[in-house]
Amino acid sequence: MEEYEDFEMEDLSELVSYMDYLETQRLTISQLDYSLSIPPQLLVSREISKLEDEVCEMLKESSLFQLFRKHKGYLNVTDLVLPLWCEVQHEYYLLRRIKKKTPKMERGIKLHQILEYETSPPSERRVLDRTSKEEPWALRLLRQLEGIMLLQKNGITREFPIWGYYKESSIFGIIDEISLNNPSKSNFNSDIRNYFNFKMYDLSFVDNKTRFSSRKPGASQILSSKVQLMYYVHLFLNYFPSLGEKQQSIFRDISPTYSNRLHSQSHWWNMFLSQLSLDGTKDLGPKFLEQSILSIPDIPEDVFAGHNSLNGLYALVFASAKKLHLRLTDDNLTIAYRNDKTGEVVYKDKFSFSNKLLEASYTKAYQFWHNLREPEGVPAEEVYKCRSCEFQKECWWLKKKQYYPLSSP
């Protein structure tokens, strides 16, 4: 089974179950209009009374990123959006190293798996050499290649891994669903060297969220879902920059500071490999080559044999996507909320990409993960969130603000 970024334990996805029955007031971009300048100091000093002494000392020396994500070398997309619910709660979970898997989360994972298997059969691809740092990323590249072929053949692919940069941060995520508006199935050719030959189609992105009730999700939950999908779109376009080269779209300038770097295929890719200490030229070996050939039989064996490395597989993925002739439009982003038992879509929210919202959200998340300021808890109008929080009694933010979360919103 593929890894499901939405439900990784360290991403604290159990917060979604808290969000389900909570209503909230409407959030606007102005509520995320934080200063985009980074404070000069590296770490924020904390009052000892707010957290345990040893925790405070630890945070004076290291940031949350250094403590909990530096070993991976990147942040997951959900790492950037989950603190939007409550940064203080998120920090408590990280520092206490609390990991839970609830029945609701299990149902969500199962639903995602069912949706994935609707578009692609179960894969037996696995890491063959557990000492290799390159193989896990090679498997993700194979999944990308398979996803592009499914997109061409069936007009839809699900659980598409994607990674890259937003400003100074390396990010990894898994896109729930990518689809073409009017795909053609008639011109599929088994030879990768000439199977891409069809008209231009609009590209749509969908993020499937599990709902545990029939009620419309609250604005706070909708906000984080929108930001999450916008991260995916940003990563996808910068991973495949040729898709937006000739289009007059807001997607062309998502991250102006880094656009030149990210739009250079070799530059950003080599930078990513270097940051994670990966060898892009290392041959993945005969066993992995055999696995590649068996898992995607539509690609000729000699093609795989000539691309049996991270650089080689990325070149295949990049070349294949470049020939897709896709067109990106500003409003083809959708959040689909599904019943956790039946999988039925109970609510859809279609929206447009917002550079301002994404940048403001990212700046806040970056400051949180790198301890550039004190974590922020919920404002007074959202104190209802605290009723289901297990840190309610000890929460320093509530004590500081003198909120009373047991009262009704």
From Swiss-Prot:
Molecular-function annotations in GO: 4 iron, 4 sulfur cluster binding; DNA binding; metal ion binding; single-stranded DNA 5'-3' DNA exonuclease activity
Free-text comment on the cofactor: Binds 1 [4Fe-4S] cluster.
Pfam families linked to this entry: Exo5
GO cellular component, one term: mitochondrion
Known EC number: 3.1.-.-
Protein family per UniProt: Belongs to the EXO5 family.
Name listed for the protein in its UniProt record: Exonuclease V
Organism from which the protein derives: Schizosaccharomyces pombe (strain 972 / ATCC 24843)
